[in-house]
């Protein structure tokens, strides 16, 4: 299956391609429905997103027991299976991230997941980030179901999902080869493997909308620089030859700059990566990269933050039919380009959530050319919270629960890219809009 990227949408003011929207402030039904939880005070363990002819389910699961590793993982899998059986259509788990407390548990984890899923094993990232709750493992997954959904596998590290004239490609579990030493060489090797995985699934980097990079020792020195800076240098060099959205311009459509992304620490000295790519022929597709009006774009940072600035957008939104999907990059307590509220986890958490709220709010969408659309914190289908220090977990969690409500959330201990930053948050939101105008056929 070969599809042209993003969709054929006319270039120019994106507002001109949307019509018939409800007036600002008009009531709209929520797209994201939160699942129940045994404890109503806790965040939901899953959310469902109805996309018309398909349903997506976001699973964010933590075991209640604290027994042996295998028992904790089996508890999660039993719970996931029960949730997916409740849906109105057969569901396929496509992409999952497993957060591990101990690297020694990964072989057992791989064995159990291999037995559980068999030939239907999803693309999987294994990340050495201890769950803040004290469990040995937590589990995030996306599942999809629907009459038109088709799943195609390209080995353990790439999978494609097609429905409604859209094709998504998930790549994950990617690591550098054995030879590379140092963050620059590790990142270069990983990106080459990511390119190969995308190619094997009949797509390429120009279609990528979201990336994740988990770097061991992210703030540790490496020569005269920090490992994160070296990772950024490699990414900038690799991306230099990639025209993100180039084929969009050839198709006379709107394009973005860099994908939304998370670059976060993990235990050890390794590197794990994954990405999401999008292909479609649909004429009503509009892709927009989002920047925060109160933050300097990461790719425009001063060289004092990194010799080569981080190449990612603060967020990426896809307007498709009557809904918008917004991927929120890893976000921290940064205003303009400077860290705020050093040493104060509560104020950093509030600032981080303020940044997310502002990024996907209607005013920012209007500034990007789309009026009367946007998302709120209640439109989030799931959230990940990375906490630098275990002792800050409960203070951070209390603020997240107050601001996010019952949105499914996983908390993991992970170093953030700057020593003074104590928390980083990412998420995905789905919000409604009226159908965009379709382009006249040639």
Predicted regions and their residues:
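Short, polar/acidic, helix-capping and beta-turn segments at strand->helix junctions
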Residues: 2-442
């Amino acid at each position: 299956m070969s599809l042209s990227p993003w969709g054929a949408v006319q270039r120019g003011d994106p507002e001109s391609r949307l019509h018939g929207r409800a007036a600002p402030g008009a009531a709209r039904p929520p797209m994201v429905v939160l699942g129940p939880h045994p404890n109503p005070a806790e965040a939901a363990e899953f959310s469902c997103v109805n996309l018309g002819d398909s349903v997506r389910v976001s699973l964010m699961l933590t075991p209640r027991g604290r027994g042996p590793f295998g028992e904790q993982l089996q508890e999660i899998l039993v719970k996931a299976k029960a949730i997916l059986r409740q849906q109105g259509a057969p569901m396929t788990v496509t992409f999952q991230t497993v957060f591990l407390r101990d690297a020694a548990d990964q072989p057992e984890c791989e064995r159990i997941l291999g037995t559980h899923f068999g030939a239907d094993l999803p693309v999987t990232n294994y990340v050495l980030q201890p769950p803040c709750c004290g469990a040995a493992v937590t589990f995030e997954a996306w599942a999809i179901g629907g009459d038109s959904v088709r799943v195609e596998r390209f080995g353990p590290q790439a999978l494609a999902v097609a429905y409604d004239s859209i094709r998504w490609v998930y790549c994950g579990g990617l690591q550098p080869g054995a030879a590379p030493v140092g963050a620059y060489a590790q990142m270069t090797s990983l990106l080459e493997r990511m390119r190969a995985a995308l190619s094997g699934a009949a797509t390429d980097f120009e279609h990528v909308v979201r990336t994740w990079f988990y770097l061991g020792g992210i703030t540790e020195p490496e020569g005269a620089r920090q490992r994160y800076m070296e990772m950024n240098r490699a990414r900038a060099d690799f991306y230099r030859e990639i025209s993100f959205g180039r084929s969009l311009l050839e198709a006379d459509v709107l394009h973005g700059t860099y994908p939304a992304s998370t670059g976060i620490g993990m235990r050890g000295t390794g590197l794990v990566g994954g990405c999401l790519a999008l292909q479609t022929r649909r004429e009503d597709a509009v892709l927009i990269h989002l920047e925060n009006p109160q933050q300097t774009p990461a790719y425009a940072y001063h060289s004092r933050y990194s010799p080569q600035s981080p190449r990612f957008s603060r967020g990426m939104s896809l307007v498709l039919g009557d809904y918008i999907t917004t991927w929120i990059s890893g976000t921290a307590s940064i205003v303009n380009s400077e860290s705020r509220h050093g040493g104060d986890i509560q104020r950093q958490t509030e600032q981080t959530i303020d940044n997310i709220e502002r990024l996907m709010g209607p005013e920012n969408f209007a500034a990007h050319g789309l009026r009367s659309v946007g998302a709120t914190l209640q439109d989030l289908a799931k959230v990940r919270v990375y906490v630098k220090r275990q002792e800050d977990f409960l203070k951070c969690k209390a603020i997240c629960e107050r601001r996010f409500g019952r949105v499914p959330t996983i908390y993991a201990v992970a170093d953030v890219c700057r020593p003074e930053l104590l928390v980083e948050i990412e998420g995905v939101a789905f919000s409604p809009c009226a159908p965009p105008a379709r382009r006249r056929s040639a």
